[in-house]
Amino acid sequence: MDSRLARLTTLQTSAGEELRRTSIIGTIGPKTNNPETLVALRKAGLNIVRMNFSHGSYEYHKSVIDNARKSEELYPGRPLAIALDTKGPEIRTGTTTNEVDYPIPPNHEMIFTTDDKYAKACDDKIMYLDYKNITKVISAGRIIYVDDGVLSFEVLQVVDDKTLKVKSLNAGKICSHKGVNLPGTDVDLPALSEKDKADLRFGVENGVHMIFASFIRTAQDVLTIREVLGEDGKDIKIVVKIENQQGVNNFDEILKVTDAVMVARGDLGIEIPAPEVLAVQKKLIAKSNLAGKPVICATQMLESMTYNPRPTRAEVSDVGNAVLDGADCVMLSGETAKGNYPINAVTTMAETALIAEQAIAYLPNYDDIRNCTPKPTSTTETVAASAVAAVFEQKAKAIIVLSTSGTTARLVSKYRPNCPIILVTRNARTARFSHLYRGVFPFVYEKESVSDWTEDVEARLNFGIEQAIEFGILKKGDTYVSIQGFKAGVGHSNTLQVSTA
């Protein structure tokens, strides 16, 4: 039974003994920022710690990093990755007089201004916006959302270079420092604010493994971030967050220069009509899969578990369908940052992802990816694809990859084998950021290399087999496929072997 439909007719409805291959990202907040809770989250399935730099001081974020590392001392397990999520360039309202929240009735006409004299003197008649060019990029008839769409305004008139006349489309309250969205409008905000640049430098100094870059609109935005990261941050992975129509429109060019992608559905669902988010999610994930770039699905995945011990059935389906779409990782935000049930949320996400993975028709999926990948491929990718083909033909239980940079493991993951990928590397950073790749189980080999290359390969391979057996991935006598290089260094993975444990 190779067809997708035939596979679904035999689908097991329980998790069974399979190992989850989708990685879980959890945002760390005050309720989870301690080593003991981080250990519990890791045991439940957490792979990547996310720090949200829209909130918190450097002192606080440093404590998250320290506690994440302390959790590894308490519970070694698999290595934990740390991600820095930038605040990004945003448009916000000014400060209301005495910080009052002003009620706004429907059809209420008022002024939006960029005049600095109103920055701290806003009310229900005049509201300051901190985007100086708004009058240049917007026109009458356009919609402006305030506070994640809680309030909607129609632009009636561009009065002058600092002033818009607007009309409310619904009732609500207008407040200080709320986010502003301009759906359907191309904005010219810089890729990085001064705060973002300082935050990136903090990330480099403190050894984060990846950057979640907010509000990416163009490929140049990614190059700007890479420039700020500099030589010391050259091995930090950049994950672009696609959150607006510009990012969607320019996605093909962005994909060429980024390391990974996040479909950030929160702001995206405000910037474009919410029903279109479904199609955009599937499209961006498919393009990322074909490019061999890892992709994260994020925002409101188990939102109700912030305050409830059980998710809604729709949320469970959302997580499962993201896995079926091809997401390498799924992410929790408030559920683990401020929620009452963070460990429950990770456990629920892990169990849901595991069952969803069993619904994937792996062989047809492999054929799709292989047929749609432009030829010729690199030697490393050819070997990676062949290793996955060997898994199907040999019914192998694992692929063991000996790698320095992690590129081979990423390319094996691209072809979505129906078994775990054991990555053995001496590079601890490679092990950590490889959590971005679906199915990759990283292990750090700490022994020094020996001069005899064959002996060194055999030692690392045996280590990989030992780890796979310890984690229940392999049993004695199981078939596995291995990939290694013919000599030391990066980019030489060209040897494939089928063996038994």
From Swiss-Prot:
Per the record, the coiled-coil ranges are none
Q: Which reaction does it catalyse?
A: pyruvate + ATP = phosphoenolpyruvate + ADP + H(+)
Q: In which pathway does it act?
A: Carbohydrate degradation; glycolysis; pyruvate from D-glyceraldehyde 3-phosphate: step 5/5
| InterPro entries linked | Pyr_Knase (IPR001697), Pyrv/PenolPyrv_kinase-like_dom (IPR015813), Pyrv_kinase-like_dom_sf (IPR040442), Pyrv_Knase-like_insert_dom_sf (IPR011037), Pyrv_Knase_AS (IPR018209), Pyrv_Knase_brl (IPR015793), Pyrv_Knase_C (IPR015795), Pyrv_Knase_C_sf (IPR036918)
Q: Where does K(+) bind?
A: N52, S54, D85, T86
A Pfam family reported for this protein in Swiss-Prot or TrEMBL? PK
Tell me where on the tree of life, at the top rank, the source sits.
Eukaryota
GO function terms (MF aspect): ATP binding; kinase activity; magnesium ion binding; potassium ion binding; pyruvate kinase activity
List positions binding Mg(2+). Answer: E243, D267
- Annotated residues that bind ATP are located at N52, F53, S54, H55, R92, K178
* Essential cofactor(s): Mg(2+); K(+)
Q: What's an example GO cellular component term for this entry?
A: extracellular region
The UniProt keywords, alphabetically, are:
ATP-binding, Glycolysis, Kinase, Magnesium, Metal-binding, Nucleotide-binding, Potassium, Pyruvate, Transferase
Q: Where is this site: Transition state stabilizer?
A: K241
Is this entry keyworded Iron-sulfur?
A: no
Q: Which PANTHER family match?
A: PYRUVATE KINASE (PTHR11817)
UniProt subunit comment: Homotetramer.
- Family under the similarity heading: Belongs to the pyruvate kinase family.
Query: What name does UniProt use for this protein?
Result: Pyruvate kinase 1
Q: Which organism is it from?
A: Candida glabrata (strain ATCC 2001 / BCRC 20586 / JCM 3761 / NBRC 0622 / NRRL Y-65 / CBS 138)
Origin organism lineage? Eukaryota, Fungi, Dikarya, Ascomycota, Saccharomycotina
Q: Supply the gene name.
A: PYK1
